[in-house]
A protein has these predicted regions:
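Asp-box/BNR beta-propeller loop motif
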Residues: 21-37, 65-81, 116-136, 185-202, ...
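Beta-strand-rich domains and repeat architectures in extracellular enzymes and scaffolds
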Residues: 34-65
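Surface-exposed loop and turn segments in beta-propeller and other repeat-based domains
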Residues: 35, 79-82, 131-159, 197-228, ...
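Conserved beta-propeller blade signature
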Residues: 55-58, 98-99, 175-177, 185, ...
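Glycine-centered coil/turn sites that cap beta-strands in beta-rich domains
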Residues: 419-428, 432-456, 509
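Glycine-centered tight-turn motifs at strand-turn-strand junctions
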Residues: 464-494, 505-511
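C-terminal tail/sorting-segment detector
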Residues: 498-519
Length: 519
């Protein structure tokens, strides 16, 4: 499949585990509209959804998108001088300050590896941008000051490969980033300089400003024989306020309440009521009328007692409750007492602190007759009663209130190129991988009234493979998508190759298009 999915290989002890963090998708064949005022977002692979009032920011496989009118129109930044064709790996904004991390893959020694390509910063809500290189170090080993009794040896990260920023948090004049091999870093001068954040090693539950410390700040020992600390492999960060910062790693959660002068370290092994697993890929905060709750996506790491799931704390991390055990959660969205959790198996909703959950089933847009074809979701956010969800098959909107319960009505937004004329057609994505995605056939009837449409798929030898629809009525004045899942009329998955599709509207001449299937 022609997609970039960051599969981070965590070398842990004598074994390894492969963990999918926030997925990045870069389909060069994915369709987009980059002009300002586009009715649709830039891409259909959405990894980040961030909302404040009517402003919505999306991180997609086709760059960054912004709406300032509740999703009615979008400004897309893909292929602009500042963003180029980079993937978006993280988005954060506060007021008019916006921070965006970008990434791509590089081929090295026969492997396709993730590489951080820097950050973009805007102080005027996305009107202008400053390009910042991915933070790297000059030396292989540095010495960092902690106090008069302690200096910390720190591994120097001299490459952007595997140094990819997965999360960003803004706290006052400070911006925090978590970049896996690049560790956690902070800048207080809008990205001109970056300092490594010193957090506890694996074997300590806290560090303070007066402690005598002996450890290495290093996510990997390597040839330099430094201490290997999974807690320094940083994946997620959240600013509860300007002083209280949470950092999630491959060894649990870290919390400071004084801007990094001291840290607490929470893990599965060190608390009576702990998190479910130590690999923390997302952190969020829910503020209700009576509670302040920290939520974390806590995935199993090295200990076989750990479980993937969601953990939440109502007392600042002293104790945790576990829920959605068995689910791989990617992020959180909130609406007062309600929490939304995008996972590999759809989006889960709870209004009672995880005691009960409602899971999205089939997502079908009754207006466009479109079905959401992917189960994985990576982003969730709300604007009043409107809930926005992002995943591998576009952007989804639903209403969640008493009169319109969550999931009772869906709107699916797919980025697509407008047809040059009503008699033309195209398919997307093309090529497509039938083992894990669908292809959409895009067309319009070109008729002034409802028309009968038949669509057939043929192989390279012009043998009939599938009749998608036959004499189906389609409305005028709009463009349609019909989904092909890469199966024939008997339900068998097709083989790689070139396929042709035929669209017949009423008794008009057939319209033809070509699809390349690669898996």
């Amino acid at each position: 499949m022609r997609t970039l999915r960051i599969m981070t290989l965590l070398i842990i002890g004598f074994g390894c585990m492969q963990a999918q963090t926030r997925a990045l998708h870069a389909r060069s064949f994915e369709l987009t509209q980059t002009a300002a005022g586009s009715p649709l977002q830039a891409g259909n692979s959405i990894t980040d959804v961030v909302v404040s009032n009517d402003t919505i920011w999306l991180g997609t496989g086709k760059g960054l998108s912004r709406s300032i009118n509740g999703g009615r129109s979008w400004k897309n930044y893909y292929d602009t001088p500042e963003f180029g064709k980079e993937d978006i790996s993280a988005v954060a904004f506060r007021g008019k300050d916006v921070w965006v991390a970008t990434a791509h893959t590089v081929d090295k020694d026969g492997q396709s590896l993730p590489e951080g390509s820097g950050l973009r910063y805007s102080s005027d809500a996305g009107e202008t941008w400053k390009v910042i290189s991915q933070p790297v170090d000059v030396n292989n080993v540095d010495t960092l000051f902690w106090n008069s009794k302690s200096t910390i040896r720190a591994l120097g990260i001299t490459t952007a490969i595997n140094n990819i920023t997965y999360d960003i948090a803004i706290a006052g004049n400070a911006v925090y980033i978590c970049s896996f091999a690049g560790m956690a870093r902070v800048s207080t001068d809008t990205g001109k300089t970056w300092q490594r954040v010193i957090i506890p090693p694996d074997n300590l539950t806290s560090i303070g400003p007066n402690d005598s410390l002996v450890f290495d700040l290093s996510p990997s020992g390597g040839a330099l024989n430094l201490q290997n600390n999974l807690n320094h492999r940083a994946f997620s960060v959240y600013a509860e306020n300007d002083s209280t910062i949470w950092i999630g790693s491959a060894a649990g959660l870290n919390k400071t309440m004084n801007r990094g002068r001291s840290w607490l370290h929470f893990s599965k092994q060190t608390q009576t009521n702990p998190i479910s697993g130590n690999f923390v890929v997302a952190i969020g905060q829910q503020r209700t009328n009576t509670k302040n709750i920290i939520w974390a996506a806590t995935i199993n790491a090295t200990d076989n007692t750990e479980k993937r799931g969601v953990s939440f704390s109502e007392d600042g991390g002293i104790s945790w409750k576990q829920t959605l055990l068995g689910e791989f959660a990617h992020n959180f969205g909130f609406k007062n007492d309600v929490v939304y959790v995008p996972t590999d198996n759809g989006v889960f909703r709870s209004g009672d602190l995880g005691q009960s959950w409602v899971q999205t089933g089939t997502i079908f847009d009754k207006t466009t007759r479109q079905r959401y074809t992917q189960s994985k979701f990576f982003g969730a956010a709300s604007n009043g009663d409107t809930v926005w969800l992002g995943g591998g098959d576009g952007l989804v909107k639903t209403i969640d209130n008493i009169s319109t319960p969550f999931g009772s009505s869906w709107s699916i937004l797919h980025a697509s190129r407008p047809l040059p004329s009503a008699t033309e057609t195209y398919s997307y994505p093309n090529p497509f991988a039938p083992d894990d995605e669908v292809v959409r056939l895009h067309y319009a009837t070109g008729k002034p009234s409802p028309a009968s449409v038949t669509i057939r798929i043929f192989d390279f030898g012009m043998n009939l493979v599938r009749t998608l629809i036959q004499n189906a009525s389609r409305l005028p004045g709009t463009e349609h998508d019909e989904i092909w899942d890469g199966k024939d009329d008997s339900g068998n998955q097709i083989v790689n190759g070139v396929y042709f599709y035929q669209i017949v509207v009423e008794n008009d001449e057939p319209r033809w298009g070509k699809i390349l299937a690669i898996q």
